[in-house]
Amino acid sequence: MALQLTDEWDKVFPKSDKVDHKKVTFKNHFGIELAADLYEPKDASGKLPAIAVSGPYGAVKEQSSGFYAQEMAERGFVTIAFDPSFTGESGGEPRYVTSWDINVEDYQAAVDFLSNQENVDPEKISIIGICGWAGVALETATIDTRIKATICSTMYNIPRIRTNGYFDSENSVEKRREKRIAVNNQRTEDFKNGEMKLQGGIPKILPEGVELPKFQKDYWDYYQTPRGYHKRSSNSNDGWAASGSTSLMNCRAFAFANEIQNAVMIVHGEKAHSRYMSEDAFAEMTGHKYETNNAPAPYTGNAPVGETREGNKELLIVEGASHCDLYDQKDIIPFDKIEAFIKENI
């Protein structure tokens, strides 16, 4: 069935007059047709470097990934922001499920597409992942040698969260078994009911009289206000399928991250609750040993603010930034450093 693509500009960010934009589609190796926004710098000539962008987890290309893609197109790159399989305007049934394997393939399919564009230099392709898709991007970098530079912004390691909970607070055999029982009971109910239950997105209204962690308030401020709300975003609406991430509970991310030879930059906010996931991924990838450990809960704060380099790998901790600041805050996202890192390594 043909994808239904909107013709209107329905992004949560203004349209740039410095780039050309159009909708494109392409298929991954699982036969799922993906929808993407293609951004090209105006009046450019010759073969250009290119970037594929996706994320955050539960978002659509009209949100943060499109914001990044348009910004990088203004800087001279051909870019696409794509909806992963089963989400947004992309194909795939059932809806609102995730698969580590299929989502890595989504990135590879985006590289396939870019490699075959007349105005793209296939030897100068990079990828950017945001939030949960930063983790997918890093995993893709382990398998796809065509990717010359990978940018992981405000990373979530989704399999780790699904398996061990936040800050590994559920990292026990007993806790994992409880979650497995719950998700498999939900599968039974889904089959009986003929549809997959959705677990709910970010609450529409913040509860009164309840002191929520700052990161939950930040998610609400992005997904449920005009700043970032989008009608096709699962986070802005009814969320992921409750049993749709079963396979993530049986997956260990970044098993071969130490074998990545091409360049990787991991960017994270100093104040982000999720910071430990980027710090740990950088250590797994490079073997880096942190000199400090002032982590309160129990991880955040191992790496110094600023740049940590190991060859062509970099961890950049952005001073004062939260997790969601790196979704769309142009004065906080280090676009100049991202651009310089990519151009240095392609």
Identify the residue ranges that each predicted region occupies:
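The serine-hydrolase catalytic nucleophile loop
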Residues: 58-70, 84
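Short beta-strand element of the alpha/beta-hydrolase
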Residues: 47-56
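Alpha/beta-hydrolase-fold enzymes
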Residues: 138-225
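Catalytic active-site module of serine/aspartate enzymes centered on a nucleophile-bearing elbow/loop
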Residues: 319-324, 328-346
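N-terminal cap/lid segment of alpha/beta-hydrolase-fold proteins
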Residues: 3-46, 327
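Catalytic nucleophile-loop/oxyanion-hole region of alpha/beta-hydrolase
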Residues: 61, 87-122, 328-334
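Conserved alpha/beta-hydrolase
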Residues: 71-91
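Short beta-strand/loop motif that positions the catalytic acidic residue
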Residues: 260, 266-268
